[in-house]
Structure formats: structure tokens, C-alpha cells
Amino acid sequence: MVRDWSACGSLLLVMTVAKDRGGPAVAGSGGGVESPELRAAYEVCEAEARQFAVELWAAAETLPVETRPSLYAIASWSAYTDRIIDEGPLEGREERLAQWSADTLADLRAGHSSHPLRRALVDTVRRWGLAEALIEEHLDSARADCAAVPVFETFKDQRRYLRGCSGALAELWVPLLEPRGPEAFRLMSVLGEACQVADLFEDLPDDLAAGRCYLPRQDLRGLGLDVDDLRRGEREEALNAFVDAQLAHWRGLLEETVLAPSTVGARYQIFVHTLLLGAQMHFDEVTLLRSRVLTQGLESLVTGDGRMSRRAARPGPGPVPGHIAVIADGNRRWAEARGLLADQGHRAGIRAVLRLVNAAQRTGIRHVTVYMFSTENWYRSQGEVAALFGAFADWFARGAQTVHELGVRVRWSGRRDRLEESLASSFELLESMTANNDKLTLTICLDYGGREELAAAARALAAEAVAGTIRPEQIGMAEVARHLYVPEMPDVDLLVRTCEQRISNFLPWHLAYAELVFDPAPWPDFDLARLRDAVDSYAGRERRFGGDAELPAQAGNLEPARNG
């Protein structure tokens, strides 16, 4: 079947606007359409997109109001095409699809249509000067998929399907997004392919049961497998290797598409970041499941009403750290290696933080602390500091509702007197909104320095001593901890630093007995597989906490004995 690639879903809502969106965005309110019939057609498209392509509908809410109706028109037409293939009696499906295709192309030639979905599509194509050949390419792919069971010998063959099914549609959108050159068209097409791979895995059990396999047969034969082995799910080692091969293909697409946000206008980059993050989150989920995905498929990361779904943890067999802290280093190097400006690296770094939150929840980690901006980072150029805080502001504006729906409690560790007032207020509002959440605690270290934190605690204790509320001999570790930025923060079990091998003035109080893992990858490349490797390394270590006993790594519930 042809699938609506927007249903790759995952975290398409991660950076969408807050829930108080206001009324519907219909062409005419921002698009200059005066015809009542055409306005009504666009309203039908939005309703259809909201019902049958909810993830894409929600992501479109990040777009300027004049752009959304056109995206709804394309999404609703594509979803309707998909439903012709998937719904209704088997007999006559090819004929119904052929008629719908012929009517669509005839309407495009005529410049008008009596069908509301096609009427809006025709107007969108003419309004933006979209390439009708891409619509024909998509319809050709749909007809081929409807006519015969798919057999893709190689990944190259599979990519031709991915291109026709989803890449062509993604490329069709590009003129809506203020493209910055021809590369935008190619990269958006690849992003469409990457999202479609996610959708293949989501529907895999149902497709296999129906005798349809969209994965390369060459990879199967190379491991001594056939399609029946995928359905049975019994040869775990070989099946894991097969899924790993698919992940390798997919990773190549994702690595290419990380450049896509930089190729569209600034107002549209959040939309592309959202789509890319959705594909990355699904990639991480398949990494977690491996061969289990063949029989279980992928859980949707959003519910039917567009809210984030809270999925159960799937910890590995070994101990899991209760608290992981991350020095997220390498955004600038990541960007430079790809010919991008530093601000694109920082926005990719924000994506990686959201990706980490999802991965930590799935692996059973309860506390995550991320070093985002140090007291020393103020010495960077004004332009880079502004870019960093612009990325933070986007995160607060787009991600607050999502992390709240995931049950994440967000806290701020750092100085609160030097940030721009609106940014500080946004962070404090997010803290308040998520204060009662208990699925995971995410602490963001912003304008944080470890020595400054300890000095501030010392100043507060000195003031208490001068006021006579505490005597110097009464000051112990508990009293110091009471005056840290986040007094209730537990000790760190595992510290991960990307790119470099330094602690960089990070959490000196909490790192006293932490295990350290240094990952050479730049922060935007940190995914679930790298987190799993770090956790596996942690699980294999003996933690003594300064004593003689050989204690295994614990899940954050062991209070080490310290000399007072």
C-alpha cells in the first residue's frame, strides 16, 4: 500500500506551537482567496488532514498562516489517495485509483475541479507554481504499489519506491518553504524517504501478514533468511543482523537530511526540524527493538488527538544509571564539518536533547542533566551567544507542551540574574508547569558554573552564620547541598561527555562518585545507540564508593558512605 509519509509521526509534535492555536487557518485569511467555494474547499482539506494526517497537520501549525492551507491541501489529497488503496472492497481498487488519478491530472490541466480536495490542490499548485510532474510521479508509484506485491531486490530498488511514494511529495512542498537554492529540493526529497522508512517499520507486522515485504531481498538472502523468517521471528541473531542492515541504510538517509533545515527560509526551519526529529526518534526506536520490530512494529509517539503518548520503559538486562549527566559538546564542530553556520549546529543540538529525553525514558533512566550553557560561554562572540539563546527560545516556545505531555519535569540549574528577562520567564514558567510530573526529571544547566555554584552556597551559609541561624560547626554536607542551585538533585551515576575528555567545571559536587564515559562523537550525533553503549559500559563497572567492598553499578539508589 502507499502510505502517507507524514504518518512517520514520532515526534512531529515535539516542536509544534502551544495548544492555544486559535481558529483554523483557511486560505483567504492569509492566502488571498476570496471565492467562498475555494475557501470551503480549503476548510475541508484542513479537516481531512487533521483526521487522517494528524502528525503533519500539527507540524504545519509551526508554519506561517499563509502557508498552512496549501500544505493541508497536499496532505489531504495524498491521504485520500492512500485511502483509496487501503479501504473499501479489494475488487475494483485499481480502477478506483486509476479514475482518481485521471481526474486529478485532468483537473490540473483544466485549472479547476468540482471535488473539494482536488479544487484546493489545483489552486495550491497554481498559486505556488508547483511541479505537476511530482504529482504524476506520486500517482505512478501509488498505482504500481496497488497493482502488485512489492519486491525490491536491493536498497537502490527500495529507494525508487521511497522516492515515488514520499520523496516526490516532500519535494512538492519546497516552494512553500522559501528554498535557498536547488539543494533544498533534493534534501527535502531525501527527508521524505527517511520518514517513509519509519512508516514501513510502523506497518511491518500487518504488511508481512498480508504477504507484503517492502525491505530489500538481497539483505535477506545474505543472512540466509526469507520473508517467512520475518513473519515467524524465530532466528533472533540473524534477524537482528537484518534489522541492523536496514538501520545502516536508514542512517545514511538521515545523515544526509540533517542539512535540510538550513536550505529553507528561517520561518520554515522549525517545521523541517520537526519532521527530521520525528524520523530520528523512530530510528532510535528500531535501534531499541531490533528484531522485535518485525513482529511488534513501532508504537506511535503521538495519540489520535495529537498528544504525546507515554510509552513504557524497555531497560536492558544490566543495571541502569538513575542519573545521567551530559556535557553536550561539539555543536560548532558538527556544523563546521557540514559547511553550516554555528547556529544550525546549536539547533541540531537542541534536537539531540529532545532525542536524549526520549531515549532515556525508553531505557529506564529517571534523571537527566544536560550542560547547555556555561558561565564561561559568555566569552564567545555576541553573534554565537545570540544564536544559542535563539535556539533555547525556540525550544521553550515549541517544546514546552510536549515535554509536559511526556510527564517530564524540567528544572533550571544555574544563575538566574543574567539571562534576558523573557527567556528567564519562559524557563521559570516551564518549571512551574511541569513541577508535578514524575516520569523523568530533565535538568538544564544554563549559565551554570560548578565553582560559582559552590561559592554561592558558601556565601549563603556565611550569611546564615552572621545572622546567627547556624553555627560554623553545624555546617556539613547536607547544609551545603541545601544551598546548591537544585538542592534535591541526586548524585550523578554516569557522566557522558561528547567530543572532548574534560569535566569543564560541571557539577563538581554531584560528580564525586560518577562513572565517566567519553564519546568522540559531536553532540548532535548522539543517539539511542550511543546512550546504550554508555549504559552498557556503566553496567560493566564495579563501583566501590571509596570503600573496600566490590559493589556492582546500581540504578541510582545507593547512597555512598562518605567521611564527614
Curated annotation (Swiss-Prot):
What does the record give as cofactor? Mg(2+)
**Biological pathway:** Carotenoid biosynthesis; phytoene biosynthesis; all-trans-phytoene from geranylgeranyl diphosphate: step 1/1
What GO terms are given for molecular function?
ditrans,polycis-undecaprenyl-diphosphate synthase [(2E,6E)-farnesyl-diphosphate specific] activity; magnesium ion binding; manganese ion binding; Z-farnesyl diphosphate synthase activity
Cite the active-site annotation.
329, 377
Which InterPro entries does the entry link to?
Answer: Isoprenoid_synthase_dom_sf, Squ/phyt_synthse, Squalene/phytoene_synthase_CS, UPP_synth-like, UPP_synth-like_CS, UPP_synth-like_sf
Reaction catalysed?
2 (2E,6E,10E)-geranylgeranyl diphosphate = 15-cis-phytoene + 2 diphosphate
Q: Where are the transmembrane segments?
A: none
Q: Binding of Mg(2+): at which residues? A: 329, 515
The cofactor note reads:
Binds 2 magnesium ions per subunit.
**One GO term describing the cellular component:** plasma membrane
Q: Where does substrate bind?
A: 330-334, 346, 374-376, 378, 380, 497, 502-504
Family membership, please give it. In the N-terminal section; belongs to the phytoene/squalene synthase family. In the C-terminal section; belongs to the UPP synthase family.
Q: What does this protein do?
A: Catalyzes the reaction from prephytoene diphosphate to phytoene. Catalyzes the condensation of isopentenyl diphosphate (IPP) with allylic pyrophosphates generating different type of terpenoids.
How is the subunit organization of this protein annotated in UniProt?
A: Homodimer.
Protein name (database record): Bifunctional protein CrtB/UppS
